[in-house]
């Protein structure tokens, strides 16, 4: 047997040993992890989520106007699919849509949109496809907007089905300041 061939076989044997050790280690780690249960950090501010009825849980995090609309459509589809596929009622699911960052403004009611809608920056709002202008109502709360990312699913519809909303306080504070400045008011008054 030549030295080149012996050298190759020696390296091959060492490689197999290393691979076997690595494989055995990963199996041991996987076995150890399989026995433990993941526990997320708990905060008092999140206790309200444990009070929601429903064993099938889903959280959708929306950060843009389009993703907020998509979250409405997806949440509605989630409930429908659970009913059709598993015979579950809407009350069997606990679904939360989080409106944060640029999606936050879509958690605001029509009174806010009527007063401040034209001042909401384009990055946080969608022009009304019917008027081609800044909206003075929450487009996702109104019917007749089937071409938006919500595909016609509205906030009142998902609320009626038991969907819950969480709204980013940091973004709301930011927008209150921005809207107050644009309209010559005070951020605290806008925030209320």
Can you say where each PLM-predicted feature lies in the sequence?
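N-terminal secretory signal peptides and thylakoid transit peptides that target proteins
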Residues: 1-16
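Loop/turn elements at helix/coil->beta-strand transitions in domains of secreted/extracellular proteins
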Residues: 55, 91-95, 160-164
């Amino acid at each position: 047997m030549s030295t080149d061939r012996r050298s190759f076989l020696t390296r091959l044997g060492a490689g197999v040993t290393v691979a076997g050790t690595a494989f055995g280690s990963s199996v041991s780690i996987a076995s150890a992890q399989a026995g433990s249960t993941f526990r997320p950090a708990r905060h008092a501010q999140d206790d309200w989520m444990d009070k929601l009825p429903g064993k099938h849980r889903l959280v959708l995090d929306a950060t843009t106007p389009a993703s907020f609309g998509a979250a409405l459509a997806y949440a509605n589809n989630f409930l429908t699919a659970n009913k059709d596929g598993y015979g579950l009622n809407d009350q069997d699911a606990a679904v939360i849509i989080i409106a944060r960052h640029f999606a936050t403004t879509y958690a605001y009611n029509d009174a806010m949109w009527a007063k401040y809608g034209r001042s909401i920056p384009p990055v946080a709002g969608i022009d009304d496809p019917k008027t081609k202008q800044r909206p003075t109502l929450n487009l996702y709360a109104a019917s007749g907007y089937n071409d938006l990312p919500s595909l016609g699913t509205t906030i009142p519809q998902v609320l009626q089905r038991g969907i819950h909303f969480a709204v980013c306080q940091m973004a709301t504070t930011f927008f209150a300041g921005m809207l107050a400045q644009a309209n010559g008011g005070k951020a605290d008054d806008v925030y209320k």
